[in-house]
Structures are given as C-alpha cells and as structure tokens.
Swiss-Prot record:
CDD domains: SH3_Sho1p. InterPro entries: SH3-like_dom_sf, SH3_domain, Sho1_SH3. Plasma membrane osmosensor that activates the high osmolarity glycerol (HOG) MAPK signaling pathway in response to high osmolarity. Keywords: Cell membrane, Membrane, SH3 domain, Stress response, Transmembrane, Transmembrane helix. SMART domains: SH3. One of its GO terms (cellular component) is plasma membrane. Belongs to the SHO1 family. Residues 237-296 form the SH3 domain. Forms homooligomers. This is High osmolarity signaling protein SHO1. The lineage of its organism: Eukaryota, Fungi, Dikarya, Basidiomycota, Agaricomycotina. Residues 1-14, 73-81, 131-296 are cytoplasmic. Residues 153-176 are annotated as: Disordered. The keyword Zinc does not apply.
Amino acid sequence: MFGGHSFDVGYVMRHPVFLVTFIIAIPSWIIAFAGQCAAEAKYSSSNGRTPVAGTLWFNIWLQLMLTVSLAISSDDLALHRFQLSIFLAIATALAVGGVEFIFQTPGAYIAIGVGWLLLTMVNLVWIVYLTSEEDTFLYNVLNSGGNGGLSSHNRRIGTSVQRRDETPGYGGGEMGLGNSMGGMPRGISSNTINSGGYGGGYAPASMEGTPQKVTSVTRNEYGHTGVQSPGIDESVPRPQRAKALYAYSASPDDPNEVSFMKGEILEVVDATGKWFQVRTPAGVTGIAPSNYLVLL
C-alpha cells in the first residue's frame, strides 16, 4: 500500500466519501482516546488490574492504524482492500462494545461512547466501499464524484517513465527503438541499407515513436527495387499483451496516461518499471500502472 511513496493526501482530497469520513473519523478517534484516558485515570481500580476500557485499548490503536493506512493509501489501494476490510470488521465488532458507554452517567464514559459510535459508522461506510464490486449500486453511490473509484488518484514518485516522444534513438549508425521497448526488434539500420535491402520489422513512426510494420523491400542486382507482398514474419516476436485487473481512469494532470476498463486486453510496448507503456484497443498509446495489469 505504501509502495515507497511519500505522503500525499491527494487521494483523500479528491474523493468525497473519503474526505467526509476522515473529517468525522479523526475527531472521533481523539474524543474516544481522550475519554478512555480520563476514565482510566478517574474510575479504574486502585491497583490498575481492572481497566475501564479493557479491550478498547487494543481497538483504539487498531483504529488508528487503519485510519492512517487509508489516509496515505496510493493507487494500489484496490490490491489491499480485502485485508483492510477484514481488519475494519474486527475494529467495528470491538467498537460496538465501546458504544455501550454512552448510556453511563460520567462524562468520560459518554465521551467514549460518542467517539466509538461515530467510528463505528465510519468503519461501516469504509467496509461497504472496499468490499463492493464495480458496477454495483452501492459502489456507484459511494463513488459518485470520485476520479475512478479505487484507482482515482495515481502517484509515481521514484518511478522513471520514458515518454513516447523520447523513445526513438540514434546511435552507432542505427535507427530503431531504444532499449526501453522491452525486447522489440530494431528498425532500419544503415548496415541493412548498404547491403541492398530493408529487413521487415518495426520501425519508428513519424508520430511519437509508435512502432509500425514496414513492408519488406528488396533490390536486385540491376538496382531495381521491388516490393514483396506483406506477410507474417515468423522471426518477429509478437508484442506482449496484458489484461486489466481493474478499471483505471487517467489522471487529468498527466496527458501520458491512458484509461482502460476492467478485463480489456492491452498491448504492452514496454514492461519495465512500475508504469508500463501500453497501447489500448482503440490505438491510444500511453502509460498505465503495472499493478493494475497482468501479463498474458
């Protein structure tokens, strides 16, 4: 979940459900924690063997861990949502015991009950959101106004991604796709031209280095050139493909990203790093988070 990323509240700020629940959860945790401290200081047994809060002390730290984990969650939240849901269910079950303090007379007890009542409601919203599958009614309701749901906000701190316009390179008398293309065949080389022909393969296109198939051209001994009929070159490896595990919405802040639906098959141009360079079925080339894809 943390993935080496620095702290960024962008995901929370961009999602209405998370924003509202965090506004409620943080003060509620403080109220519950302060109430437990006050109750222990004033009403616990003199020998300290009979605490007032009991198991709520375990739950208060579990709740803090879950709140912080969701607050610093990145674009791979979807991969950890089931684990988070399990711990949230445990925290909710324990929190119900803390709600009973709301019926007591001392002010510290009432504070404990109010704090845990609000935290219980927040936990239930989080559980419903994290466990709802896409295209369901509850998911669409809780995700209204967000940027792509569990994949809404993306971060790539520490990730080096080569742009498409930087892909074509020149060196050693050869023009072709750079090493970042992940094993794709070279394009047109000066050695091939001098020897009297162009080898069939992938060559850089005129627009943003998109690989395109070129027709094999031969030259006979009299200098005449002839075009062979295009066919499948068995020596050229087929491009790698990947299946989308989750739907992803491209960030409006990065024009290099591409959007795709769950289950779509994408053509992988570069499979190195945390961000793959892919081509969608619509022919759009850009980058996509690798943890949302599985190579076929």
